[in-house]
Amino acid sequence: LFAEFARCVKEVQPKMFLFENVRGLLSHDFGRTFSTITHTFESLGYTLQHKILNACYYGVGQKRQRLIVIGIRNDLINKISFQYPEPDDHMTILRDVLKNVPKSPYQPYSETKRKVMELVPPGGCWIDLPTDIAKAYMGKSYYSGGGRRGMARRISWDEPCLTLTTSPSQKQTERCHPDETRPFTVREYARIQSFPDSWEFTGSLSEQYKQIGNAVPVELA
């Protein structure tokens, strides 16, 4: 995808360009991947600047850190001054974005998973489960290192949602509704990504979740 983007920049020679990616791109392959990307665009006649922005400080009810890269054509570098937007002085929380959300379908939990998630309080995760249930639910992950706070995670109303993925109920990145024992609905997913309720998604339920999870949050964009 990067190579195709670079090809387009080479052919079009825009005054400026922007691309977005996960923050892990900076450290991928010990930084060599991002270095290659930087050198490629520099060889095309662009000066790059980059910054990590967290969506929850830009009106999005979600902790979603993204790498935002700006390229400015060298012949315009003294004529164009780009400043990243200033963050809000507070995080946007789930309660702020899910008021009066329209009803819509969701992918229900299995009965086994539902019984496990019913034991988790808002803001909690697998750590709040009885030890025997946590071991049975997590399997080998129970004995692995790291916090694994995404497993059996129920979001609190008073915090931003964790980063949405392309599926609402993956075991390693659970995002359970604060009050109801279920994943977020399609419209809740969209609200958390700051899409307006008028925005329509098409395809199967799983395809709609994927479209929303892959998107750049509207308010951040």
Over which residues does each language-model region extend?
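S-adenosyl-L-methionine-dependent DNA methyltransferase catalytic core
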Residues: 40, 66-220
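Conserved Class I SAM-dependent methyltransferase catalytic core
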Residues: 1-64, 68-72
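Buried hydrophobic packing segments
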Residues: 5, 220-221
